[in-house]
């Protein structure tokens, strides 16, 4: 059964570890992430961008697939299904479809409008027992068609959004989606620390987890980050393993062209990547505590 992300993130914040949000794109992605979480006894958040939701034919399809897998695979760790970088309209669609968590990305609105819309969605989400994430300061790079520069959020604006009753807060601290350029200046821990001082127990979210050095990830967790989003690294691992299978001519051997065989190395690579991240974030074994 899907759960809100609230309890798992509050526990993570108090226990100084982070729960991974791993974005799903299809059946293989979903299965690999769920199996990795079950194997490591870690809570997990399945992220769905609006683009991925559309690709999978709609949010109801996603909910049906995820709920079916939780049952068929006997998944016993806490799993939240979360809309990633949701538009105002997208949030309502996911609430209706049966998601257990949403993110409203109002970072491109003026702060007053962002606050107004967030306030409204907080009320609706809470009424349905769902968790809700808000964002202040855009995250750089591109995610599901949403493009951001990678700025640092204003800690005071973060506090005003946190005070609206959101479950978790994503704040730009110089992080970007996708691969980090060589001239990237790194995360602004000064900004993160200032945000944590003002937002207290609020679980903070780090978007663009791919390519951030491990020591920076650990430092971010020590400064209140309780949810870390990973997408690009899983995509790269999948692509590399699939390319190797084809380049090695495996698809030409026997029934190697069968999609179940052709996609298996990529699915295994995703699972391995998720296990590595779960261990790095410190959430291994936390489902049983």
Task: Walk through the language-model features, giving the residues of each.
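Extended, intrinsically disordered, low-complexity segments
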Residues: 246-289
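Hydrophobic alpha-helical scaffolding
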Residues: 23, 151, 228, 232, ...
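Short catalytic-loop micro-motif centered on adjacent basic/acidic residues
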Residues: 19-23, 81-82, 103, 204-207, ...
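Active-site proximal loops enriched in glycine and acidic residues that flank catalytic Cys/His/Asp
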Residues: 173, 208-210, 232
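Alpha/beta enzyme core
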Residues: 3-11, 15, 27-52, 57-76, ...
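Metal-dependent phosphohydrolase cores
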Residues: 21, 213, 259
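Glycine-rich nucleotide/cofactor/substrate-binding loop typically near the N-terminus or early
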Residues: 81-83, 240, 249
